[in-house]
Amino acid sequence: MNDIRQTQEYANYLSQIGWRVERSAEINYFIKKIPLLGSILKIQRPQEIRISKIRELAKKYRAFQVIIEPKSSLDADFLVSLGFHLSKSPYLPTKTLQIDLTQTKEKIFKDLEKDAKSAIKKGENIEIADCKDNLEKFRGAWKKSVGLKRYVPALEHLASLKKAFKNNSLFLMTGDESAGAIFLSGDGIGYYWQAFTNREGREKHEQYSIVWEGILRVKKIGARIFDFEGIYDERFPNKSWLGFTHFKKSFGGYEVIHPGTFVKWFL
C-alpha cells in the first residue's frame, strides 16, 4: 500500500493550494517555487527512489533544495551515499501507530486500553456528525477551541481537501462542537489527520469517541489499516508529542518507524 502522500488525491490537493505536482510511474514529486532562489523539490514516502527522475526535475525547476522522506532504511542509506543528510527537523511523523482494520470491530475494541474503553462506553450517546457540507462551521469550532495557540488551516484549504478526497474524507464533530477531527483514506489506509478539542471536550474525553467513530467509518469504506499519523519519537524528541502519544497508544495497535527526512542543498 502506498502512503497517502503518494496518492492521486493528495497530488490533487497540493496542486490546489499552490504546489506544482509532477507524477511519474505513480510517484508524486512536489515542487514549490521560491521567488529569486528557484524551487524546493519534495518527495514523500515513494515506493522507490528514482534518482534519475529527481535529477531531471531538480534541473527543470532549478531546485536549490531536494527533500526526500524515504520509506525504508535501505533507501535512506542510498540517499546518504548520494550526499543527502538526515535533517533534525522531520516534515512527516517519523514514528506512528497503526491498527489492523481487517480484524472485527469487537477484536479492535478488545485491544483498546482500559481508559479508552471506558471513555468510549461513557460517550455512546454523544452525537457525532460529518460536517463535510458545513466546513465553515467545522473550522469555526476548531478556531474557537484552540485560539491562537495552534495553526488552523484556511477554509480554502479545507475545501480543497474535501474536493480532492471526496468521500474518502471525514470532518467529524460532536454536536456541542467541543471536539472534532479530520480523517482521510487513501490506498487502503485511513489516517487520523488533524483534530481539535476544547476544555469541555477534554473533560468529557470526547476525542476518544471521535477517534473510535473515525476508525469504524474508514473501516466501513474499505480501509485495511488505520494510521494515527504520528507519535513521540526518541530519535527526534519533541515534547509536544508526549500528550498526543499517551492518548493514541490507548487505542492499541503496533508501532511503525520511518527513517526521517533527508535533505540536499544545491546553492
Cite the ranges covered by each PLM segment.
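STAS-typified acidic loop motif
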Residues: 39-49
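Non-catalytic accessory segments adjacent to catalytic cores
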Residues: 49-96
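Short catalytic/ligand-binding loop motif for oxyanion handling, primarily in non-cytosolic enzymes
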Residues: 37-39, 74-77, 234-236
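Short amphipathic alpha-helical segments and helix-helix/interface helices
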Residues: 51-58, 76, 120, 158-162, ...
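A conserved beta-strand-loop-helix scaffold within acyl/acetyltransferase catalytic domains
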Residues: 1-37, 82-202, 217
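Short beta-strand segments
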Residues: 42-44, 65-70, 194, 225-230
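Aromatic (often tryptophan-rich) hydrophobic motifs at membrane interfaces
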Residues: 55-57, 167-267
